[in-house]
Amino acid sequence: MAVADINKSEVIKQFARGANDTGSPEVQVALLTTRINELTPHFKANMKDHHSRRGLLRMVSRRRRLLDYLKSNDADRYRALIEKLGLRK
């Protein structure tokens, strides 16, 4: 299930660093977090859906790599993003 276009554009507006920013780490992490949060109820209801779970784990891994990149290059932006998204660290 993909993120709805309206929801996606709202997330991009909220986390963009500029007017046409769609590729910054903040936007990418926010979009991945939105997709992960939308898929979580599916896996609670369908525990044996291992094929889709693999895709979820890829998204989580990709988000982790983007967060590591952001943390190594700009720790202040990293902390602000983690706080804004409500992630654990």
From Swiss-Prot:
Pfam families: Ribosomal_S15. GO terms for molecular function: rRNA binding; structural constituent of ribosome. Keywords: Ribonucleoprotein, Ribosomal protein, RNA-binding, rRNA-binding. One of its GO terms (cellular component) is cytosolic small ribosomal subunit. One of the primary rRNA binding proteins, it binds directly to 16S rRNA where it helps nucleate assembly of the platform of the 30S subunit by binding and bridging several RNA helices of the 16S rRNA. Forms an intersubunit bridge (bridge B4) with the 23S rRNA of the 50S subunit in the ribosome. Part of the 30S ribosomal subunit. Forms a bridge to the 50S subunit in the 70S ribosome, contacting the 23S rRNA. This is Small ribosomal subunit protein uS15. It comes from Cupriavidus necator (strain ATCC 17699 / DSM 428 / KCTC 22496 / NCIMB 10442 / H16 / Stanier 337) (Ralstonia eutropha).
